[in-house]
Structures are given as structure tokens and as C-alpha cells.
From Swiss-Prot:
Homodimer. Its main location: plastid. GO terms for cellular component: chloroplast. The gene is S-ACP-DES2. This is Stearoyl-[acyl-carrier-protein] 9-desaturase 2, chloroplastic.
Length: 411
């Protein structure tokens, strides 16, 4: 991935010409069009208003092509399962939420604003702590923060799930209450990291803010198919991934001497762990009620691959921004291919997939066999990929990140 990036402009033009450069659509008499050299022929614009309209529409499309998405695949019979689980969710799921009055808030970790002298003193202390932290760490921390800030997309996506979505925006079903309260808890994560990064002075906040706007506007390709089986499997995986990622940024912050930042990342990781436990409990209950349908859904999601929610990340410059951010995260050990396989192994053990027996159809048994051998296959692929990376790393490719004022970071 990194070795193909000979030029940002070249990559941008290859993957999405509209991002790199665009020219008016013309019909040229007697010559082919070869920008940017001026043409010495007469040209007649064809339907310029339509061209402008099409260009405007494309401005708001994701930077990456999103394939045709399948919708509403759950059967009525399986929808009834979620209806029957409402009492269970009321008693078991909502217990993983914390009351607002007992919850931490971003201001608990930030400089005090009610005392001007103390505020400036604490900001200076914060900047002194962060000024020696390397750029690659900030690239990953910014990427993590942007992922958290795209929370509107995640709430919207969860509310596409048939049988559990919030039908009114204020529904009192336990599923709807959970999604709103989970969103409220998650909202603090992006708020806190955003403010801390702003005060550090180490990142270009305008480019960070542009990336957030681009990402929320692009949405995500969840592959849920409006199916709550798929949705809760995905969130189980994703919450564990964010728990690992924030936990590792906490460890690195400690290494770099910023104990406050370490506490921030560790506190966020603890929230993610609690949310992971809640979502894995839902899937555990589904395995109890419908082992055949659940194991098939899990196999289906793994065949499609669990894609991180910020995979459509873009800053208006780098069409491969998410891949570059992920490559840096892999290199410094925040989130790696090893973690991906480890999460799958953890969930397979948690849900005792290998022990499933009675009640599985032929398709269910095939899904079980596929899942139980998948981690080993992923690790073999990972080893081959690592070998290729080692060979390629001799050239030490680097990429410029707008988030850190265009400075280059090794991939």
C-alpha cells in the first residue's frame, strides 16, 4: 500500500479524479483534450448546468467506492426473537450503562477554566508534557479521535437495524434506550480527545475538523443489511478493537511521560471494555436462543470482513488517509493485524462456538468449521504480509499528514 504512493496527486487522480483536479466537460472540434496545455481550437460546452449539478453531487460522495449494499435480510421469525428478548435486555443490557451523575466528564481531565491564572498555568503544563511526544503517536491519536467524533454515523447505523431501532427518536424500548445512552457515553470520548489535542498545539485542528466533517458526511459501509444479528456481532468486535487501541495509546503515553493523557486513554478504554461486554452478552444470548442463525451470521460477517468504522476517512487531500493512519497504528503497535486475529479468537471462545453441537443445520456446521479454522488462516496471511512489509521497509516509505501541518511520518 505505502510503496505505491509515489505521488499524492497521482494516487488521487487514479482513485478519484474529482478530488485531485476537475475540468469542465467540453466537446472539442478537431482536437483531443490534454490538460493543462491550452487548446488552440474552438470548443463548445455541452450542458454546463448538468455538469455542474453532477459535480456538486459527487462532492458529497465517499472518497472510496461503496459497493451495492444489501438491505433487510432478516426474516419475520427472527425479528420475533428480538421482540421476545426485550425483558432480558431491560434486566441485563441496561445494567451496563452508568448514571450520568456517576459518570466522568471531559472537564475532569482538562485545565480549569474558572481561574484564569490557573488555566494558563495548566495549559502550559499540558503543552510541556506533549511537546516531546513523537509525530507518529499524534497521527494515531488524531485518527482515534476522529473515529470517535464520527459518532452520529454510528448511532444512525444502529438505528437502521430492524427490530431494535429507535422508531420515534425517544422510544422507551430497552433497545432504543440502550442505543441513546450508549451514544451519550461514547460522545464524551471524542469531546475529551478533541479538546486535549487542541490545547496541545501539536496538531492542525482545521484539517482535523475537515476530516471529521468529511467522515460524518461519508457515512460507513457496515454490511449490516439492517440485520441486528450482524449489527451486534460487529459492535462486539469493534468495541473490543477500540478497547485495545485506546489501551495501547495509554501505555505509549505513559512511556512518553504524559500521565494525564495516559489516564484519559485508559479511562476511555475502560468504557469500551464495558460496552464490549454488553454487546457480547447480546450475541451470547442469541447463541443460546438461535445457535444456527447466529453462527451463520457470524461466519457471514467474517467472510465480508469486519471493516473499521472510519474506513471512509478523508481530509480533502489524501485519498488513502485511512490506510496510512492504519499503517502507522500497526507500526507503533496501537492496533495490528495480530489484534484482529486475537479479537476473533477471543469472541469464538467467549461464545463457545467450537462447542456448538445440537441444533445446527448443515449450513450451520459448515459455518462453525469455517470460523474455528479462520484465526489460524488469518495468522498465516499475517505472517506472509509481515514478511513482505519487512522487505519493503528497507526503503522506509513516509507520507505527509495534514493533521500535523504536513510533516511526514514513516509508515
Amino acid at each position: 500500500m505505502a510503496l505505491l504512493l509515489n505521488s499524492t496527486i497521482t494516487v488521487a487522480m487514479k482513485q478519484n479524479p474529482l478530488v485531485a483536479v476537475s475540468f469542465p466537460r467540453t466537446t472539442c472540434l478537431g482536437s483531443s483534450f490534454s490538460p493543462p496545455r491550452l487548446l488552440r481550437v474552438s470548443c463548445v460546452a455541452t450542458n454546463p448546468s448538468k455538469t455542474s449539478e453532477e459535480t456538486d453531487k459527487k462532492k458529497f460522495r465517499p472518497i472510496k467506492e461503496v459497493p451495492n449494499q444489501v438491505t433487510h435480510t432478516i426474516t419475520q421469525e427472527k425479528l420475533e426473537i428480538f421482540k421476545s428478548m426485550e425483558n432480558w435486555a431491560q434486566e441485563n443490557l441496561l445494567s451496563y450503562l452508568k448514571p450520568v451523575e456517576a459518570s466522568w466528564q471531559p472537564q475532569d481531565f482538562l485545565p480549569e477554566t474558572n481561574d484564569e491564572d490557573r488555566f494558563y498555568e495548566q495549559v502550559k503544563e499540558l503543552r510541556d508534557r506533549t511537546k516531546e511526544i513523537p509525530d507518529d503517536y499524534f497521527v494515531v491519536l488524531v485518527g482515534d479521535m476522529i473515529t470517535e467524533e464520527a459518532l452520529p454515523t454510528y448511532q444512525t447505523t444502529l438505528n437502521t437495524l430492524d427490530g431494535v431501532k429507535d422508531e420515534t427518536g425517544g422510544s422507551l424500548t430497552p433497545w432504543a434506550v440502550w442505543v441513546r445512552a450508549w451514544t451519550a457515553e461514547e460522545n464524551r470520548h471524542g469531546d475529551l480527545l478533541n479538546k486535549y489535542l487542541y490545547l496541545s498545539g501539536r496538531v492542525d485542528m482545521r484539517h482535523v475538523e475537515k476530516t471529521i466533517q468529511y467522515l460524518i458526511g461519508s457515512g460507513m459501509d457496515s454490511k449490516f443489511e439492517n440485520n441486528p444479528y450482524n449489527g451486534f456481532i460487529y459492535t462486539s468486535f469493534q468495541e473490543r478493537a477500540t478497547f485495545i487501541s485506546h489501551g495501547n495509546t495509554a501505555k505509549l503515553a505513559t512511556t512518553y511521560g504524559d500521565t494525564t493523557l495516559a489516564k484519559i486513554c485508559g479511562t476511555i478504554a475502560a468504557d469500551e471494555k464495558r460496552h464490549e461486554t454488553a454487546y457480547t452478552r447480546i450475541v451470547e444470548k442469541l447463541f443460546e436462543i438461535d445457535p444456527d442463525g447466529t453462527v451463520q451470521a457470524l461466519a457471514s460477517m467474517m467472510r465480508k470482513r469486519i471493516t473499521m468504522p472510519a474506513h471512509l476517512m478523508h481530509d480533502g487531500r489524501d485519498d488513502d488517509l485511512f490506510d496510512h493512519y492504519a499503517a502507522v497504528a500497526q507500526r507503533i503497535g496501537v492496533y495490528t493485524a495480530t489484534d484482529y486475529a486475537g479479537i476473533l479468537e477471543f469472541l469464538l471462545r467467549r461464545w463457545e462456538v467450537e462447542k456448538l453441537g445440537m441444533g445446527l443445520s448443515g449450513e450451520g456446521r459448515r459455518a462453525q468449521d469455517y470460523l474455528c479454522t479462520l484465526p489460524q488462516r488469518i495468522r498465516r496471511l499475517e505472517e506472509r504480509a509481515n514478511d513482505r512489509v519487512k522487505l519493503a521497509s528497507k526503503s522506509k516509505p513516509s507520507v505527509s499528514f495534514s493533521w500535523i501541518y504536513g510533516r511526514e511520518v514513516e509508515l
